């Protein structure tokens, strides 16, 4: 019998991490796309790093950052009352770390491709940077941002290595669908693995279809984000 907990956990983790990625990633993307500052290349490289490093390496970094003996880990435990590692919240952190760089890269491309005349007109009318971002930039790039969000959700949904390192593979607690498929294959439960694979594949197709739909720019031709 198939245990559907890993699927629901994966969907919850992906949804929460995507919202957090939007809150963090849009500002970083806007900063990189429109401002020059010292160490910009270093920040850009740091954003790209999670896209190229092995997941186990990223997971190790997160263990160092959020382990019980680390300052961040101690602060989290003091606030929440329990350690972060080997909890479902750790799976959110893993997914966030995995998905945010993709969202930043996609959002930055959307911001850089925006016709600068709109921004100049808004500034000439006295719009602040805050108002410019919310009232001009986001509405004009909303479809690209939604497409990037869908791709970030899909990336978070399929994370394996980072989640395994920091959240573990605890059935009923931290086992996501990717980990459940691995366990099913390892234990010889082919039917369970096949069912989960088919379900997650359907979910992925739906997400990618949404991403491709929103990638249609209202000011230009359809462009696929993938």
Where in the sequence are the language-model features?
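Interhelical loop and adjacent transmembrane-helix boundary motif
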Residues: 1-5, 166-205
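Periplasmic/extracellular loop-to-transmembrane helix junction in inner-membrane transport proteins
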Residues: 1-19, 31-39, 78-81, 184-191
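Transmembrane-helix boundary motif in ABC transporter permease subunits
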Residues: 16-47, 60-62, 110-112, 116-118, ...
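Transmembrane alpha-helices
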Residues: 19, 97, 104-107, 111, ...
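Membrane-helix interface segments
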Residues: 35-43, 71-72, 87, 117, ...
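C-terminal transmembrane helix and the adjacent membrane-cytosol boundary/short C-terminal tail
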Residues: 39, 101, 106-127, 194-226
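Membrane-interfacial helix termini and adjacent extracytoplasmic/periplasmic loops
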Residues: 59-96, 167-170
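Non-cytoplasmic
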Residues: 67-70, 145-183
């Amino acid at each position: 019998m198939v245990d559907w907990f890993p699927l629901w956990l994966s969907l919850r983790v992906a949804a929460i991490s995507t919202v957090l990625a939007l809150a963090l990633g849009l500002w970083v993307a806007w900063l990189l796309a429109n401002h020059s500052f010292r160490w910009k290349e270093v920040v850009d490289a740091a954003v790209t790093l999670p896209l190229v490093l092995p997941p186990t390496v990223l997971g190790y970094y997160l263990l160092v950052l959020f382990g019980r003996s680390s300052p961040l880990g101690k602060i989290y435990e003091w606030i929440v009352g329990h350690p972060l590692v080997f909890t479902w919240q750790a799976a959110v952190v893993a997914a966030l770390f995995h998905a945010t760089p993709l969202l930043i890269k996609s959002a930055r491309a959307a911001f850089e491709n925006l016709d600068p005349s709109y921004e100049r007109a808004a500034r000439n009318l006295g719009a602040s940077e805050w108002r410019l971002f919310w009232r001009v930039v986001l509405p004009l790039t909303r479809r690209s941002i939604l497409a990037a969000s869908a791709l970030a959700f899909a990336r978070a949904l399929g994370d394996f290595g980072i989640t395994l390192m920091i959240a573990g593979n605890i059935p009923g607690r931290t086992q996501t669908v990717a980990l459940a498929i691995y366990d099913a294959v390892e234990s010889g439960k082919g039917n369970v693995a096949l069912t989960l694979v088919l379900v997650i594949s359907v979910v992925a197709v739906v997400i990618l279809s949404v991403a491709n739909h929103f990638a249609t720019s209202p000011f230009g031709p359809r462009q696929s984000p993938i």
